[in-house]
Amino acid sequence: MVRIGIVDTGIQNPNHPAIVGKIVAGRNFSLDRRKKDDISSTTYHGMAVASVITSINPNVELVIAKVLNYWGEGTPNTTADGIIYCVNQGCKIINCSVAGPPSKKLEEAIRYANDKEVIVVAASGNDGKTTKYYPACYPDVVTVGAADNEGNRADFSTHNECVDTLALGVDIEVAFRDGTINDTGTSFSAPIITGKISLLIENLSK
């Protein structure tokens, strides 16, 4: 069973059918941290990302690193803390549907993951420009942009030399509260690639 780290907002509903029983560890690194083991969230983003992964490969274990608060606020250093935590929890892949400025600590966290042979997948961003966001633009990160329903780059998808591949990013069904909604963004393109990589790892280990 492949273990996957999700560096994001935490989990809105741990009993949602898409993820129930799959979370094996979690830590709160966000700016609004109250308790270090509190990975709960009133926003759905992290759970939505997790549900995209499990829709592709249900046979996974999830490690949750909460690095963003309700408003989506975080720092490169909280993201770095989340990545390091997921590596140390034995994850083979880490999904980062977060984007922000660079920092030395974040760069070192990516290098640490690479040294431990952990694959980091990151969303390119949603500004439709050539802006460089991080961790997406660090070397050896699998950077994912969004494609539309025709397979072309979606207008909102950040595009630059950092982008390695595209995945569908329009009208993706994701977990929300007790049910689902359809949402759009590179945040949901990245976990499609994460899920597919997990299938490859699973098949290679047989």
Predicted regions and their residues:
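Active-site core segment of subtilase-fold serine proteases
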Residues: 1-61, 81, 88-89
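Active-site/binding-pocket entry motifs
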Residues: 12-13, 29-30, 55, 59, ...
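Glycine-centered tight turns that cap/initiate beta-strands
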Residues: 18, 140-143
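Substrate-binding/access-modulating region of protease and related hydrolase catalytic domains
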Residues: 48, 65-140, 148-153, 159, ...
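Hydrolase catalytic cores
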Residues: 53, 65-68, 169-206
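Structural detector of well-ordered beta-strand residues that form the stable sheet scaffold
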Residues: 63, 119-122, 142-143, 166, ...
